[in-house]
Amino acid sequence: MSEKKEELQQSEQSSKSSQPKTEKSKGSKKSFNPIKSLKASGFFKLLKERTARFNSGSKAAIPSEYPINALARKLHPAFQFVKISKVEEHGPDCKTFTLSPDASRGTTELAYFASGQYVTVFITINGLKFARPYSLSSSPREAIGLSGFYQITVKSAKDGLVSNYILENWAVGAQLTISAPEGHFDYVPLRDAPTVIGIAGGSGITPFLSYAKSIANGDEDFTLILLYGNRNKNSILFKDEFDRLQKQSPKIKVIHILSDENALCSENTESGEIYEKGFITASLIKKYAPATPYSIFLCGPQAMYNFADKEIATLGLEKKYIRHEMFGEIHSGKAQEGYPGRESAEVTITVTICDQVKTVKGNADDTILQILEKNGITVPNRCRSGECGWCHSLVKSGKVWVPAKMDFRRKADEKFNFIHPCCTFALSDLELDVPPAK
């Protein structure tokens, strides 16, 4: 009996061993544990090698500053401290100021710049802070070194608070704070033509004087044909300097255009002086422009821009060949083309600067920046023409308007209600987020 039972058990075991494996057994894999694959000896070997590499490194201390950082600060300082070393008068309403580095306040050398750029001057008048841009009339070469200098020219403007304050108060020895050079009115060979027709009006001649100096000393390589508009001969700025530069370089030619009906206009071939009567029109540009491609650079008062742009539009030039220096600050919204009108003559603006909230009132005919400044609120700004981006702010509520000729915002800024207060007018009460003063 027991023998049969033993045979039966052996038969069952044999039957089980001969059965095919199930799907589960076929698909199963042995799990991999990476921790178990590590060997302690390998870790200690790596640690030893790593320590050896550390010990073989330089014993010199990590420098607190690298040369590239020092160079960046020299080229693009947050501020520059200067003092007035010379004042030159051009009649009762215009002066040229020579600015030298003020070593006593930490500026030993001035930042380098390109002809066509400007600096912003920071001024406090009766406790209110203002910033105004002025084109550099000196050459980049004149700014180099310990004896380097900048030159700016300030002309009185009608109802101009800052310009009149400067002309009445600035004198030799006065200490000033200015920005690093900024702006994009410089000559770029890859974009601009080999010949530039410069159109200047009044004190808008200053960047062209810097260009002419750079051409004469070989730092710029293009031909400058300058059409310089003034009322009469007495209002021409830097005439002697341009006469000298024309003789120094054949690439510089100056034509004076006088608008005064009584002005005597003729070509003096002996001295090289050329005068035209009237205004800078398309036909006048064609008269002096070369047959080859040329660029037009403009710098002058807003009235000149408004007139010249219409004339230039008839010339059929590519857009890249027409360059404008900053349009300049605007002072009256209702005087601008396309102004839609406002809800009231006075607006209330609630301003958030970081965690501070202030509410002020102002004249709706002023730009938003002007309203804030008159209420003692300092907003970072440089160009005051909607170009530099320093005053970039967010409109949280309310309606605003920007003149088309001064609207340089990106599409994203328009979509998400960002503005430049320096060239924007309030059409209703507003809530704004503005950047803090630097």
Please annotate each region the language model reported.
Residues A143-F149, L190-P194, D219, F425-P435:
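Ligand-binding loop in jelly-roll beta-barrel domains
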Residues P207, I377-W401, K405, A412-S428:
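Local cysteine-cluster metal-coordination motifs and their immediate loop/turn environment
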